[in-house]
C-alpha cells in the first residue's frame, strides 16, 4: 500500500494537470514560483548563475521577465496581477541594460553586443509593449525597440549567413530565430517594414538545416552558416517556441519533427532527449 501511495505521489509531481496551462490559462503554481525567483534575483541569484555559465546573469533575468510577460498577457488589463507583471518585466529589462548583463558580449559585433544580447533583450522589450495599450506605451521604450529592430535587420541584410554571431566567431541559430521573431513582432505592433528581411532569412535558414533530422542545427560556422554540430534537444526546445512566431507553418512542421525525434516520456514523466534516439 505504501508503495502504491508513493507511486501515486510521484505521478502527481511528474504529471501536473496540463489543462491548467495554456495560452489563455495560468497554472496556480506559476505566480508563486515567479515571486520566489524574483526574491532570489534580488538576493544575487543572477550573479551566482553567472559563475556557472557565461550568459547566466543575462539569461536568468530575461527569462524571468518573459515569464511575467506571459502572466500579464493572461490577465485583464489594469488588474493587480497585470500591473505586477508589467512592473516585474520592466525591472528585469532594466537589469539587462546594465554593464553586468552586457559584460560577456563584444561591442564590436554586428549588431553591437551580438545577436544573443540584442535579440533576447528586444524580445522582452517587445513583450512589454504588448502588455500596454498603444497610447500608454512609453515613447523611449517604443523608440528603443524600433531602433534595435533596425539594427538587427541591417545586420541580417549584411550577413553572408542567416545566423548572426553571439560572440566573435561563434554563432548559434536559435539566437537568430529569436532576433527574427522580434522583427515579426515589430510588424505586428507597428506598420510592417521587415517583411523582406524576414523572408530572405527564412529561405536562407531552410537551406542550412541539419540534413539527418531536417532541423535547425545548434551551432554553425559564423562566416558560412555551415553546420558544425547536429541537432540537439536543448536547442530545439527553444527553437520550437520562437520559430512559430516567425513562420507558423514551418514552425509547426519543425516542431513535429522535433517531437518525433527528441520527445521521449519516461514512466509517465515528460522528457526530451539531448540527441536523437539513434545517437548515443
Predicted regions located by residue number:
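Non-transmembrane, interaction-prone segments in cytosolic or luminal domains
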Residues: 2-13, 48, 71-72, 83-95, ...
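Extended ligand-binding groove/face enriched in aromatic
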Residues: 53-62, 66-177
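Structural helix-adjacent loops and short alpha-helical linkers that scaffold large soluble proteins
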Residues: 16-31, 71-90, 128-146, 187-199, ...
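Glycine- and aromatic-rich loop/turn segments at beta-sheet edges
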Residues: 33-56, 91-111, 152-170, 206-229, ...
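Low-complexity, Ser/Thr/Pro/Gly-enriched N-terminal "stalk/linker" regions
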Residues: 3-63, 67-70, 87-101, 140, ...
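Extended ligand-binding clefts on enzyme/binding-domain cores
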Residues: 116, 143, 159, 169-280
Amino acid at each position: 500500500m505504501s508503495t502504491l501511495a508513493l507511486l501515486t505521489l510521484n505521478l502527481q509531481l511528474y504529471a501536473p494537470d496540463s489543462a491548467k496551462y495554456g495560452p489563455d490559462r495560468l497554472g496556480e503554481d506559476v505566480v508563486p514560483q515567479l515571486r520566489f525567483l524574483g526574491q532570489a534575483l534580488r538576493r544575487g541569484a543572477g550573479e551566482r548563475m553567472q559563475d556557472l555559465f557565461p550568459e547566466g546573469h543575462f539569461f536568468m533575468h530575461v527569462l524571468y521577465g518573459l515569464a511575467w510577460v506571459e502572466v500579464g498577457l493572461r490577465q485583464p488589463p489594469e488588474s493587480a496581477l497585470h500591473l505586477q507583471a508589467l512592473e516585474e518585466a520592466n525591472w528585469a529589462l532594466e537589469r539587462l541594460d546594465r554593464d553586468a548583463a552586457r559584460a560577456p558580449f563584444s561591442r564590436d559585433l554586428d549588431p553591437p553586443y551580438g545577436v544573443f544580447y540584442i535579440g533576447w533583450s528586444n524580445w522582452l522589450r517587445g513583450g512589454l509593449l504588448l502588455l500596454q495599450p498603444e497610447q500608454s506605451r512609453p515613447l523611449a521604450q517604443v523608440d528603443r525597440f524600433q531602433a534595435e529592430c533596425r539594427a538587427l535587420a541591417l545586420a541580417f541584410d549584411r550577413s553572408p549567413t542567416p545566423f548572426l554571431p553571439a560572440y566573435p566567431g561563434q554563432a548559434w541559430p536559435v539566437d537568430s530565430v529569436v532576433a527574427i521573431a522580434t522583427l515579426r513582432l515589430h510588424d505586428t505592433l507597428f506598420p510592417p517594414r521587415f517583411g523582406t528581411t524576414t523572408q530572405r532569412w527564412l529561405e536562407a535558414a531552410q537551406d542550412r538545416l541539419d540534413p539527418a533530422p531536417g532541423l535547425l542545427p545548434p551551432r554553425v560556422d559564423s562566416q558560412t552558416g555551415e553546420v558544425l554540430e547536429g541537432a540537439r534537444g536543448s536547442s530545439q526546445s527553444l527553437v520550437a517556441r520562437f520559430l512559430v512566431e516567425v513562420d507558423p507553418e514551418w514552425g509547426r512542421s519543425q516542431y513535429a519533427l522535433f517531437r518525433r525525434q527528441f520527445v521521449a516520456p519516461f514512466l509517465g514523466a515528460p522528457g526530451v532527449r539531448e540527441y536523437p534516439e539513434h545517437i548515443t
